[in-house]
């Protein structure tokens, strides 16, 4: 049985990934998997109406919401994480952060990464490759995750998205068989 990762990403960052602008996802932790591994993109639910509107065609941005409405609360695609890079921002001078230098591939400035990770703390840049966008987004319960239960540890249908990321069984694996053998 091969593991993959379900990663929760806010709508505005999913849009940048789908546009090809964001090729490095910054996280505080990383999975205990050898690269390359598959990641499923869960687009989180929006905080405001229409915040999860993701443009799939240029013309859609002038006529929303419509058929191009795509997003929150669903798995919208997948990618292969082929490299995980260590990321660490250290700053002793606030003036150095004022320039707001963007870290390549992240769509984030060094200041934003510093605020997210903390001064001198290491994070990880998950490199996005082989991006596939689903024609029809998938519900979270169509994926299977590992969970502790009354009957012990086993693989079960997901009923909620992970806070950051979590392990799932890749599509094509027999989830029912693994539940019986867990």
Annotate each language-model stretch with its function:
Residues 1-182:
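Structured alpha/beta reader/binder surfaces that contact nucleic acids or chromatin modification marks
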């Amino acid at each position: 049985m091969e593991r993959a990762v379900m990663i929760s990403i806010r709508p505005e960052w999913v849009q940048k990934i789908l546009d090809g602008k964001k090729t490095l996802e910054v996280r505080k932790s990383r999975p205990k998997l050898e690269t390359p591994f598959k990641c499923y993109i869960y687009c989180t639910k929006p905080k405001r109406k229409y915040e999860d509107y993701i443009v799939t065609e240029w013309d859609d941005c002038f006529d929303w919401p419509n058929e191009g409405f795509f997003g929150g609360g669903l798995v919208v695609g997948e990618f292969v994480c082929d490299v995980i890079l260590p990321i660490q921002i250290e700053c002793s001078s606030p003036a150095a952060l004022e320039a707001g230098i963007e870290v390549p591939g992240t769509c984030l400035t060094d200041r934003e990464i510093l605020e997210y990770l903390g001064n001198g703390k290491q994070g990880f840049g998950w490199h996005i490759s082989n991006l596939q966008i689903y024609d029809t987004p998938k519900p979270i319960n169509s994926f299977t995750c590992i969970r502790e239960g009354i009957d012990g540890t086993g693989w079960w249908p997901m009923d909620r998205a992970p806070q950051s990321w979590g392990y799932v069984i890749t599509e094509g694996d027999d989830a029912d068989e693994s539940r019986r053998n867990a």
